[in-house]
Amino acid sequence: KTALSQSKFDMEILEAGAKGHFYLELVTREEDRATGREEEMEQELARIFQGIQAGEIRIGSKKTRGFGQFKIESIGEKNYTKDNYLEYADAYDEARWENCENVLKEWLDQSGWIPKMVQIEVPLQLKGGISIRQYAARKGEPDFTQLTDHGIPVVPGTSFAGAIRHRIKTILQELKNTGATLPKEYSEIIDIAFGYVDKKRACSSNIIINESEIKNAKQLTMMRTGVSRLESAVKDGALYKEKTYVDGKLSLKARVKKGKCPEDEKWIIGVLLLALKDLQNGFLAVGGQTAIGRGLFSADGPIRIDGKEGLEDTYIAEAIKNMRMNGGGK
């Protein structure tokens, strides 16, 4: 991915922890109850609520990179019929809902929820520092600081996704060079896994990577001199102050959508796990200033897939199995 010329833009986001509420209306007819359609609609609504709780239904942009996830804290419900239709005039009055019974559990219990994503969790230990910069907004602050959310250093899903995407591309190229027959061209595999926009055609990413908080990290402020990337020499008068974090722990949480074709799901998970293994072993750096050792990690525990440990080798073997080696059959 490369930057577009003259395409810089600003955007406003809501930080984690913001709260709000929304209203939802379900309109049913008398015949819906007789035919069972009312019960079906309620169950579909319950599945939507469960999908939100599970993090599989998100809102807004950059949903596949950790944005737009929220939790339902409570659900209040009111029924309006021909006997009390006048009360509907106050349906959107917040005060009317303050003492309403919380029926969230009842709705979730009737959902019959079946997860539509495979969840992968990778515990990581930060080796040294990390540099995902935000620039100073006030006088007297360091020129560059590590990106934070409510004062907690974070690694955004976009940073992880960019590094992992590039590593998967390298892995696929190496597999092809060793004689493997890929299920599709490696560029098409990347597009399916990470999404694409091609004029009027587009596909959202099948891999979702959340923002990760770095816990128990030590804050470090240092003075540095800028270096010319063309000459590899010190720039004159380019002294700057930087605030970074070192030696913390974090958990990378990724999801892979379950599609109509199970084979696609298997090889997507397989090649993703190969890249995550490189991340755990310190072969893949994330963020900026990687040339001076920033953004490297080590394993802080086993990879968990849908809450179970020790499954990654099976998924990787399945991915390789779907690729035919020269002279090895299918």
Task: Describe the residue ranges of each PLM region.
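Small/polar/charged residue-enriched interaction surfaces, especially the RNA/DNA-contacting tracks
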Residues: K1-K330
